[in-house]
């Protein structure tokens, strides 16, 4: 029954680019070819061949001879044998007796079904697809499509305007974020410097602890020396009182001897006793000389004891001054140690807080970047729905909150590098001051070595060594005191120092 050739169905010129250029736009068709057709409206098993053309949403059919004219002139006849509107039609494949590749076209307004048949499965599939696509073109769909196009155009213009505004704002905020990244890098570099300064602080604290222990030992030694001097002062005072008492007794004895000599001189002696008088007088004179010699010796001892007491008083006063000096230096070192410990703890807390803030900022920055990417994808997407619009609004709100928070914190974050730079400069100035103090300490070491120890006649070699140790401790304490005073002076006079944290405050 199938006598037609396999090329009875041909694609439309719109599907073939070479043929599309040769046709007028009004004559372009979607598909044409020869199909079998059963009569409409009456029950008949007879099939006849017809030339069919799909033009827009209409199916036109002619006699089979019209195909040759159409392929030659590329124009279709405007007087077809019949026209079937395809808008809203249901097209499906169907098997008929002797026609395995049949197609049924039905519509609620048709009084019957339109039955067509192709000669191969490929042709059937091709015609089914094109008929179904053409059936989608209706007046209602055209009106809806036009309204949708206008709505999408207006929405596209509004979204394009909003996109441009968002892009401008995002460019400004991106520049702000770049500036914040640079500030964060500067803060990280300064944190590294401060970490090195923290290590130096720990070394200074350790040195101060060692010096404090040494001062405690030297202070105990000074206290023992002072106690020995006080004991020596008591012994010298007792010796002086004893010598004074002895001198008074000798003075009384001398006075009595002189009185006896005066009485012997004034009293007349018998002639018989003249031979015995010289020995008695000589004895009194001898006793008087002995008393005078003894008094001179005691006076010399008394003067020596008074001299020793004076030296001991001077030594006691010097030791007392040294003890007070060591006590004040020990207290100063203790205060400095507490301040440095507090400053170290404060610096650690600030570093931890800075790391926490930086991690939070990086987290919020990642969230903002994710929201920005989502917003870009939503703006570039051609498909619009309510869910995507809600997501875009949420992304915009998130970005707005993030940038507003960045603007609020901009001033405070801008001041942080200046404060941290000032702290680094102060530490550098303190380091230079430490070197200067050490230089002056080396210069003053010669003056300490030239000093003579003030020792009394009872000072032993061990006490002399202790005095030398006390002088060395005094030198170290003097050096440390200047160091601490110089640091406090630099920190008090440096610009911006009031913004630095101080331990214990």
Curated annotation (Swiss-Prot):
Q: Which residues form the PH domain?
A: 28-136
In this chain, the stretch annotated as Disordered covers 264-284
List the PROSITE patterns hit by this protein, alphabetically. PH_DOMAIN
User: Which positions carry Omega-N-methylarginine?
Assistant: 502
Alphabetical list of Gene3D superfamilies matching this protein: Pleckstrin-homology domain (PH domain)/Phosphotyrosine-binding domain (PTB) (2.30.29.30)
Q: What Pfam families is this protein classified in? A: PH (PF00169)
UniProt entry keywords in alphabetical sequence: Coiled coil, Methylation
Per its UniProt entry, which superkingdom is the organism in? Eukaryota
Bias type Polar residues, positions: 267-278
Coiled-coil intervals in this record? 146-391
Q: Which family does it belong to?
A: Belongs to the PLEKHD1 family.
- Report what the protein is called: Pleckstrin homology domain-containing family D member 1
Q: Which organism is it from?
A: Rattus norvegicus
